[in-house]
A protein has these predicted regions:
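A short beta-turn/loop motif at secondary-structure boundaries
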Residues: 1-2, 66
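Conserved C-terminal alpha-helical bundle
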Residues: 2-60, 81-87
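Alpha-helical structural motif
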Residues: 3-6, 18, 49, 77, ...
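Residue-level signal for nonpolar/aromatic packing positions in well-ordered secondary structure
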Residues: 7, 53, 71, 105-108
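GST superfamily/GST-like fold recognition
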Residues: 22, 62-87, 91, 97-99, ...
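Acidic/histidine-enriched, glycine/proline-rich intrinsically disordered or flexible terminal extensions
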Residues: 118-131
Length: 131
């Protein structure tokens, strides 16, 4: 029961905090209408939620040798954060523990295969981010 509760806690952090902060960056993708202040504020919000995630990770009882349902959203969200860093100049502070978590879940074939299939659509979407 405790592991399910912890998995729900991770999932809720993603679904109610981190992912909405990342989603708020989509209106800033188009180069012609980008608001640099919104990008700066978005980076600060995302960084805050990544710091919260690092705190959860530091005390997590979830077995790191298994891929949990709550991990799946983070994999794609991390990919979008990195894409927005490159395309929008999004300033993000990545905690060391979160980068280690990203690498760990990216090591699962289910995640790496999905990201490989998904990335071309991301790249296509981001073409409007450049002049």
């Amino acid at each position: 029961m405790q592991l399910r509760a912890k998995a729900r806690e991770f999932g809720r952090l993603h679904d109610t905090r981190l992912e909405p902060a990342v989603r708020a960056m989509y209106p800033q993708v188009a180069f012609a209408t980008r608001d640099p202040q919104a990008v700066e504020a978005g980076g600060a919000a995302i960084s805050k939620h990544l710091a919260s995630l690092e705190l959860l990770l530091s005390t997590s009882p979830l077995d790191p040798d298994h891929l949990w349902l709550c991990d799946c959203g983070f994999a794609v969200t991390f990919a979008w954060i990195e894409a927005f860093e490159a395309a929008l100049g999004l300033p993000v502070d990545w905690p060391t523990g979160v980068r280690a978590y990203q690498a760990r879940i990216g090591g699962f074939a289910a995640v790496s295969d999905e990201l490989a299939a998904y990335r071309p659509a991301m790249d296509d979407y981001l073409t409007k981010a450049y002049p």
